Design a protein with these regions (language model features):
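Class I S-adenosyl-L-methionine
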Residues: 1-145
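C-terminal target-recognition/interaction regions appended to catalytic cores
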Residues: 101-245
């Protein structure tokens, strides 16, 4: 399987896509490809990616959406402690019960909560966020506070009852994009980002701050990966239970 940004299929009028397909077919593989949105597979995030599945045993179709109603940011993170900038610790107790089926799924087999630590933002960033109402964006900032970032999505807050925009490797920077908490004056924590990526809470991320951001932000969302794996298993006549083993 190959995963990349959706623009790969159209870049250079499709030249890169054609080169990939032709090269892999010369190796004896049948190739199928499609743009999949992780939000269609239970991930609380709009994340469109080009997916290639390659097989020596016939062309494998890509999965169809597995849900009828999308998982929201509220579904994903509302049960997590409402930390302010600089608060939290690497390991802590849960302080509330799960409030959605998704939260129950994320907490399955997890006794403790990890990686829920808020960035220690500079005071100037916190003051900017205080000017932005819940679930809104930089349009509420005075022009002189817009900074050098030209994109409209910078300084944006997530919306509780919608899917998140695509999580990237700078999700903990308040100015980076629409990755600030819906109403708290901070960017999302690594655990909140992991939940939005569909990593359940038994995944513990270790290493430097930069390395943790890369682990979370560059990953294929596990629920999307599972849907693809289930489709491959079905192609080979395996049921889901066998696939999970």
């Amino acid at each position: 399987m190959i995963e990349n940004v959706k623009g790969l299929l159209l870049a250079a009028n499709g030249w890169f896509k054609d080169e990939i397909v032709q090269t892999i077919e010369k190796l004896g593989y049948a190739v199928n490809f499609k743009i999949l949105n992780a939000a269609d597979f239970g991930v609380p995030q709009s994340r469109e990616r080009a997916i290639f599945i390659c097989s020596r045993y016939g062309k494998i179709s890509l999965p169809e959406p597995t849900i009828s109603e999308r998982t929201t940011v509220r579904d994903a993170i509302e049960d997590l402690a409402y930390l302010e900038s600089g608060e939290g610790s690497f390991e802590q107790n849960y302080i509330t019960e799960p409030k959605s089926e998704y939260q129950k799924l994320m907490r399955k087999n997890s006794k403790r909560l990890y990686n829920h630590q808020a960035s220690n933002h500079k005071q100037v960033a916190i003051e900017k966020l205080k000017l932005i109402p819940p679930e809104q964006g930089k349009e509420f900032l005075p022009e002189e506070l817009h900074g050098k970032q030209k994109f409209k999505t910078t300084w944006g807050r997530l919306k509780w009852d919608a899917v998140s925009p695509t999580i990237d490797t700078r999700f903990d920077a308040s100015s980076n994009g629409t990755n600030n908490h819906p109403f708290l004056n901070r960017a999302i924590t690594p655990r909140e980002a992991a939940r939005i990526q569909s990593f359940d809470d038994v995944f513990v991320f270790v290493g430097s701050k930069v390395y943790v951001r890369k682990q979370v932000g560059n990953a294929v969302p596990p629920l999307l990966a599972k849907a693809i794996a289930d489709r491959i298993a079905e192609h080979f006549g395996l049921n889901r239970e066998e696939n999970q083993r």
